[in-house]
Amino acid sequence: MSMTELSGVRTFLLGLQERVTAAVAEVDGGDFITDAWQKEPGEPLQGNGITKILENGEVFERAGCGFSHVQGSRLPPSATQHRPELAGAPFEAMGVSLVFHPRNPYVPTVHMNVRMLAATPVSAGPAEAVCWFGGGMDLTPYYGFDEDAVHFHQTCKDALAPFGGDKYPRFKQWCDEYFYLKHRQEQRGIGGIFFDDFQELGLEQSFAMMQSVADSFLPAYLPIVRRRQSQPYGARERDFQLYRRGRYVEFNLVWDRGTHFGLQSGGRTESILMSMPPLASWSYQHRAEAGSPEERLYKEFLIRRDWV
């Protein structure tokens, strides 16, 4: 990948961060704090980034959106599970990652990430760098609504349609398999799309597909926020929201490759953990009441299901 191509990816990602945070700030009425950072000389990773975070807003308790562009001397194990030939290779990675935790339990939590990684096998020269893209988005409701799930998945499907009819079903299944808490035997949410190590369309079209996914995020999520943000709720709904947020914490710390990659490679911990909810709770052997909306979430939404 040339310097010009790398610059194009960086420019797109920075613009994406600006567009998303501006739109979310307009919905919430609050302001994002901008924290630009630079890695110090001598650290395992070199590079820079911008973390934007909104906390204690009207709509969002925490909304974090981070851009990072880093270089390292050795790919960490979390990035070479499917590419053993790249173990220990120097690499360059950049991406935008966001997680929004709403205040109202009827508004779902959302995660989106798009990224590019280039690595040079130890035995190769710079011209032989291997480059791939990854990304996706997924929705984690606390109370399920069919119309929200259908809208989210349809928007994801439409974003991938120009790149082949096989992409949505493949990436939807990948998402279902990835965002699964093995120790709980539960889906994290209703899924969405997920792809990684992707280069099969060639550099230009693979980047275009990543851009299409990124550009579909606001149309996929904000209509759901607007539909649910003023819905009345009480202590019961809030308690269940906090309990389910505990599952989010468990997944991110135990299973998420992105979190592991950041921590294993010497990334910026404060930015990596901005995905954590501001409040969460755990209750021993919690059981949803039979026939309740909470039970419906488990039976009808936290399952692998074709929404479109």
UniProtKB/Swiss-Prot annotation:
This is Oxygen-dependent coproporphyrinogen-III oxidase. It is found in: Cytoplasm. PROSITE patterns: COPROGEN_OXIDASE (PS01021). Its EC number is 1.3.3.3. Homodimer. The keyword Oxidoreductase applies. It comes from the Bacteria. Disulfide bonds: none annotated. Residues 248-283 are annotated as: Important for dimerization. It comes from Polaromonas sp. (strain JS666 / ATCC BAA-500). The keyword Lyase does not apply. It catalyses: coproporphyrinogen III + O2 + 2 H(+) = protoporphyrinogen IX + 2 CO2 + 2 H2O. PANTHER family: COPROPORPHYRINOGEN III OXIDASE, MITOCHONDRIAL, OXYGEN-DEPENDENT COPROPORPHYRINOGEN-III OXIDASE, MITOCHONDRIAL. A divalent metal cation binds at residues 101, 111, 153, 183. Belongs to the aerobic coproporphyrinogen-III oxidase family. Pathway: Porphyrin-containing compound metabolism; protoporphyrin-IX biosynthesis; protoporphyrinogen-IX from coproporphyrinogen-III (O2 route): step 1/1. Its cofactor is a divalent metal cation. InterPro entries: Coprogen_oxidase_aer, Coprogen_oxidase_aer_sf, Coprogen_oxidase_CS. It is an enzyme of class 1 (oxidoreductase). Involved in the heme biosynthesis. Catalyzes the aerobic oxidative decarboxylation of propionate groups of rings A and B of coproporphyrinogen-III to yield the vinyl groups in protoporphyrinogen-IX. Substrate binds at residues 97, 113-115, 266-268. GO terms for biological process: protoporphyrinogen IX biosynthetic process. The record marks 183 as: Important for dimerization. The active site is at 111 (proton donor).
